[in-house]
Amino acid sequence: MGGVLSLLFNISEIAAELSLSTGFTVDAILTGEAFAAVSTEAAWLIEIEAVDLAGLSTLEALSLTGLTTEQFSLLSAIPTALNNAIGIGVFFQTVSGASAVVAAGVTTFGYSKEVPVVNMALVPWFPQVDYLFPGFTSFSYYLNAVLDWGESLFHAVGREVWRHLMRQATLQIGQATRAVAVRSTNELSHTLAQIAENARWALTSGPVHIYSSVQDYYRYLPARNPIQLRQEYRNRGEPPPSRADFEYQENREGQRARRELGYDEPRSGQYVEHYTAPGGAHQRVTQDWMLPLILGLYGDITPTWEVELNKLEKEEDGPSKKKARRSMQKNMPYSRSRPQAPSKRRSRGARSKNRA
């Protein structure tokens, strides 16, 4: 086993010296990448016939790559010797397994990287700190929060203050708008009520004149002759009356017209007397016929209308359950004795009923 270790040590020294003379890295020499690169370059020179054109031999053409024959031989022999040494170490395993451990260590040895890994610009991987020190990430987070509390606290408090201000501003604007609308409505209602109370009201018969004019128009129309009356009765499918009936009907209509003309028509322009508060109290007063209007402007209702509304609400909601229960209790027969539950037992003792 000591010979294997000395062989590996010598191979490492030769690879280090060869790296200084050729410019290749130690890991490239041990893995065989340097030999593969030199072989590829020599094959390329032979392919383009540079050796034949120059009139040089193959060994002299190898010097064009910058390497000597000894260096080329060492580049090809070192990877093979390293693999053989590792195989010998695995073959001569001891009971304790020291040779296997040495072989594994030599196999890695920092030079067992693959070609893509060597050529690519990768970042070394480090395990998570929590694997080695559980809870360190949480501790670092809280430590960072404690160290940077000033800025975060300023932003958090500023954000909450801004949200509170916006919320309060929205509420204040809504309340102010609602208050202005309610105040404007109340002022308008109060103004209309004052106008209605202090206005000068007069009785007029304008609508009555309209209906009376229509009535006079139909009254003074020419009377229908007997032929028109008979035709009207025939259209309705009724037997026409006699001449005496016609005369009686005409006399009756004339008497009714004369009786209606004898009535006095209501005069227009009669003003309603406005009375002040009794006793000089200077309180607001209004006429009885104007009271529903004034109360409606202020949002109140008259007692009569309140009774009507209560009736309508009771009809919509239906009779209450309490009244229905009372009516059921009245209809049930009255009895003093209360029914006993079937689950009750008179004798709950452990002794038997036959105690004799």
From Swiss-Prot:
Highest taxon in the source lineage: Viruses
Region (D1): 268-303
Membrane spanning residue stretches: 289-309
Keyword Transferase (UniProt): no
GO molecular function: DNA binding; structural molecule activity
Region feature Disordered, mapped onto this chain: 233-267, 312-356
Listed GO CC annotations: host cell; host cell endoplasmic reticulum membrane; host cell nucleus; membrane; viral capsid
Pfam families in the cross-refs: Polyoma_coat2
Residue spans of biased composition, Basic and acidic residues class: 244-267
Lipidation (N-myristoyl glycine): 2
Keywords: Capsid protein, DNA-binding, Host endoplasmic reticulum, Host membrane, Host nucleus, Late protein, Lipoprotein, Membrane, Myristate, Transmembrane, Transmembrane helix, Viral penetration into host nucleus, Virion, Virus entry into host cell
Compositional bias (Basic residues): 343-356
Region (DNA-binding): 308-354
Short sequence motif named Nuclear localization signal, residue ranges: 320-326
UniProt biased composition (Polar residues): 329-340
GO biological process entries: symbiont entry into host cell; viral penetration into host nucleus
Family: Belongs to the polyomaviruses capsid protein VP2 family.
Protein name, UniProt field: Minor capsid protein VP2
Organism: B-lymphotropic polyomavirus
Organism taxonomic ancestry: Viruses, Monodnaviria, Shotokuvirae, Cossaviricota, Papovaviricetes
